[in-house]
């Protein structure tokens, strides 16, 4: 039953993401981070199933989106003032999803639960070469019709910093713009707002110009 609810939850989440590729849906940096509880720690519970079901139904009430779409990679510094200004409940700029919530979306074999969990662990996005993650980000950006990708390199995280070059080259080959931000996702004392503000606004300006020129 638990694994069955997990499959149902993921089905609703996929339905939600398919709709969000074209629609506006209010969100915040904090909500995107808290989704990790639903997609990982609490996946399979009745409450999480209700949550994803409500997402899939609720988004149908929202209008088509004509702003700038962003796919976020790795952690979100939810306290950062500039990022909050641009991505918290903003109709012009929308973070559609983060790859951390989509590290394994295949359906589980409920008739063989232990084998299903083993497969889930072995085939997880973070198990294996970084190339797997880079290719997944490209696929996700295309599916979400993203205008660009932002990768946040959390200080001390070798995985996020070490794979940036490969991610950049993979996205470049797919003609998808990438912004790499460095900082501390947890400790606001290590946040350099001036640098983040300058680089983010320049990146968003480029995306806006490209999107407007293609309209």
How should these model regions be labeled?
Residues 2-99, 104-107:
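A charged, amphipathic alpha-helical module
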